[in-house]
C-alpha cells in the first residue's frame, strides 16, 4: 500500500455539491454512472482525488453475498437517514490480492477482491476506459467508516 489514493464522499445533493465545488473554483469530471446503481464525479488533484458519490439508480444496487463487499450497498446504507460525507478512504496498491492478505493478517474483516471497468468522460470530453481492482476491509468497531 503506497498511500492515500482518494476519498469517497457520499451526497444526496449531488447536483448542488457539484455546483458548489465548481463555484469555488474546482474542475469536476462529468457525472458518470456505475452499472451497480451509484454515480460519481471527481475532483482530480495531483496524485489524489475526491470522489463524490450519489445514488441515481437505487433499483440497480445489488445485495452483496456474505464474502463480497458491496460498494453500492455500503454507500446506499451510509446515505440512509441523510448520511452525508466521507464514507471511505481508498489507498493506492498495485496488487489487490496482496492487500487482502495483508488485511487478513492485520485482523480485519475482508471480502473477495472486486474488479470492474467503465467508460469515463474526461474534462476535455474524451471518453476513456478506466478499470479498477479493489480489496475491501472493514472492522466491527468502525461500522460507518
Where is each model-derived feature located?
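N-terminal start-of-chain detector that recognizes signal peptides
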Residues: 1, 13-16, 23-25, 59-65, ...
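Vicinal oxygen chelate
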Residues: 2-13, 41-46, 49-51, 62-145
